[in-house]
Amino acid sequence: MHDSLTIALLQAREAAMSYFRPIVKRHNLTEQQWRIVRILAESPSMDFHDLAYRACILRPSLTGILTRMERDGLVLRLKPINDQRKLYISLTKEGQALYNRAQTQIEEAYRQIEAQFTAEKMQQLTHLLEEFIALGNSRQEDIPGDNE
């Protein structure tokens, strides 16, 4: 048993990434870039702040990552005419094609995990983590300060 929940969660993340990291590297992406591609593949366009939150990337870091991804032709940054303060991000056709190529390999990695850990345990773990995340999110809402 782990004495530290945060260390156990980090070690679990590393264990999971051992299945996915080689795939991400094969597609010449960083882990952060893959998170962005995966999130945007599920949403046609996303607000910059929402993307930062969902990808667990600090906004200043996200700016640099998106600049490189835009240069590589994977994403577009769009500002609405009616609100120049907003910034939306979407995948390009090339970004979507990259996601489609990688996704087959990602699904195979999930099958490997389920074969070793079982689909039932994966479902239980995911459910428990979602509950814990919701608990943490509700605590963050109670903290005074910048809650954008």
Curated annotation (Swiss-Prot):
The name this protein goes by in its record: Homoprotocatechuate degradative operon repressor
Keyword vocabulary terms for this entry: DNA-binding, Repressor, Transcription, Transcription regulation
Protein task: Repressor for the homoprotocatechuate catabolic pathway hpc operon.
GO biological process: negative regulation of DNA-templated transcription; response to stress
One example GO MF annotation: DNA-binding transcription factor activity
Xref: SUPFAM superfamilies: Winged helix' DNA-binding domain
Domain HTH marR-type intervals: 2-134
InterPro entries hit by this protein: HpaR/FarR, HTH_MarR-typ, MarR/SlyA-like, Tscrpt_reg_MarR-type_CS, WH-like_DNA-bd_sf, WH_DNA-bd_sf
